[in-house]
């Protein structure tokens, strides 16, 4: 009974924090005030301040986490509605995803080499632009550290969501197709949530890109390691 009450309180506080950050973002729509980022910082700060362990938070957090699956499945609806566009533009979509995936991996390697990062961490940073569950499996298969891969995936997601819109504006990419592919390829699920601001077509393209990156990344990860003799 006590754990049930704790779980309910944690769920309510988490949802309340997120809604408050959404309201803040609507009032001040700045790139670094995106609700996912500010809510994460707020929750981490609260856990540290009140000395609450990760396991303690996950008593309620696991129920919120369980909604991730249905949320991903729900992305099938905009895909269905935009299917004719996806079929029509399948070649540029696939080309954009391949370029985004390869650049994501190669940029990670360049960053790692520039800062002299250890070999294990280098392999962990490789799948940073792929959605977390798949990135963990790729990193483990390559000999990386899965826990560090999660950190790099989060960094890629947040940096893409914050800087992505600025680059899209700077490069004058106004096509929902291009915006969705860019956000989904670079920032996986977080990029897809950001694509909501660009419309239904952008969300569809972002979810397609995220899925294709996960599938193709399983093949290209080992290939990049082999090509660059890592």
Swiss-Prot record:
Q: Where are the transmembrane segments?
A: 4-24, 30-50, 67-87, 91-111, 148-168, 210-230
Compartments (UniProt record): Cell membrane
Q: How does the UniProt record describe the way this protein sits in the membrane?
A: Multi-pass membrane protein
Q: Which UniProt keywords apply?
A: Cell membrane, Membrane, Transmembrane, Transmembrane helix
Q: Name one GO cellular component term.
A: plasma membrane
User: Is tRNA processing among this UniProt entry's keywords?
Assistant: no
Q: Which InterPro entries match?
A: CidB/LrgB
Disulfide-linked positions: none
Q: Which family does it belong to?
A: Belongs to the YohK (E.coli)/YwbG (IPA-22R) (B.subtilis) family.
Q: What is the protein name stated in its UniProt record?
A: Uncharacterized protein YxaC
What organism is this sequence from?
Bacillus subtilis (strain 168)
The lineage, from the top, is: Bacteria, Bacillati, Bacillota, Bacilli, Bacillales
Task: Name the encoding gene, please.
Answer: yxaC
């Amino acid at each position: 009974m006590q754990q049930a009450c704790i779980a309910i309180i944690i769920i309510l506080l988490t949802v309340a924090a997120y809604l408050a950050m959404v309201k803040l973002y609507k009032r001040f729509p700045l790139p670094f005030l995106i609700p996912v980022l500010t809510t994460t910082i707020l929750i981490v700060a609260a856990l540290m301040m009140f000395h609450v362990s990760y396991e303690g938070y996950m008593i309620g957090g696991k129920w919120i986490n369980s909604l991730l699956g249905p949320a991903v499945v729900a992305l099938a609806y905009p895909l269905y509605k935009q299917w004719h566009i996806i079929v029509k533009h399948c070649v540029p979509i696939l080309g954009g995803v391949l370029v985004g995936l390869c650049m994501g991996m190669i940029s990670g390697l360049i960053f790692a080499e520039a800062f002299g990062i250890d070999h294990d961490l280098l392999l962990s940073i490789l799948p940073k632009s792929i959605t977390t569950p798949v990135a963990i499996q790729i990193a483990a298969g390559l000999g990386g550290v899965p826990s560090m891969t999660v950190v790099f995936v989060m960094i890629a997601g947040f940096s893409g969501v914050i800087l992505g819109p600025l680059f899209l504006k700077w490069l004058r990419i106004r096509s929902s197709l291009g915006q969705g592919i860019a956000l989904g390829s670079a920032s996986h699920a977080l990029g897809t949530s950001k694509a909501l601001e660009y419309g239904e077509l952008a969300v569809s393209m972002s979810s397609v890109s995220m899925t294709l990156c996960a599938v193709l990344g399983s093949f290209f990860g080992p290939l990049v390691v082999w090509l660059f003799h890592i």
